[in-house]
Amino acid sequence: MTVRTVLIAALTAAGAVGVPMTAAAEPARSAERADAASDAANQAVVESLYSAFAAGDGATINGLLAADLVWIEAENGPYADRNPYSGPGAVFEGIFGRIGAEFEGFAVAPATYLPSGDRVAVLGRYSGTNRATGEALDAQFVHVFTVTGGKIVHFQQYTDTAQWMDVVTPD
């Protein structure tokens, strides 16, 4: 690659007007389009999970989770006692089942999706009222998903575990 080709590719990438697209710059654009398509597909899988959770659609949730799923709750949180959860059954029993039994009106509200390759980070909030304590939960979260072949293979939760523990622990 000549210095001229590199310079033209750099100017083209910077948005310089009137600079012709070179053959050297086209593969980079093609790779960017493929990455964007992959990001969008993986984000769609994660969005489907949140929609299914909100609808109480366990069959769809189960279909989005890989059989060899590894799910990790935030350390020191009320559901981290069984970390790492292996497979959808462990997640349904150890997390979803317990939350359903312990909270009234529990909701997971994703606000921002940040896809990058096979990972999708999601920023949002949890809300609900603990049945035993009557305390309301309103905690931020970051969820980091790894998606492979249209299935969620890994999940890592980050949240305000101190708030969770305050809400679930009787005075």
Positions of the model-derived regions?
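A solvent-exposed, acidic/Ser-Thr-rich amphipathic alpha-helical stretch
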Residues: 67-112
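Bacterial N-terminal signal peptides
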Residues: 9-18
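A short hydrophobic beta-strand element
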Residues: 118-126
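Short, cysteine-centered beta-strand-loop-beta hairpins and adjacent loop/turn segments enriched
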Residues: 128-138
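Short beta-strand edge/turn micro-motifs at domain boundaries
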Residues: 140-166
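Short, surface-exposed coil-to-beta transition loops
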Residues: 107-108, 136-142
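Short, low-complexity N-terminal intrinsically disordered segments enriched in polar/charged residues
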Residues: 4-5, 18-63, 169-171
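Hydrophobic pocket/interface hotspot
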Residues: 46-49, 61-62, 69, 91, ...
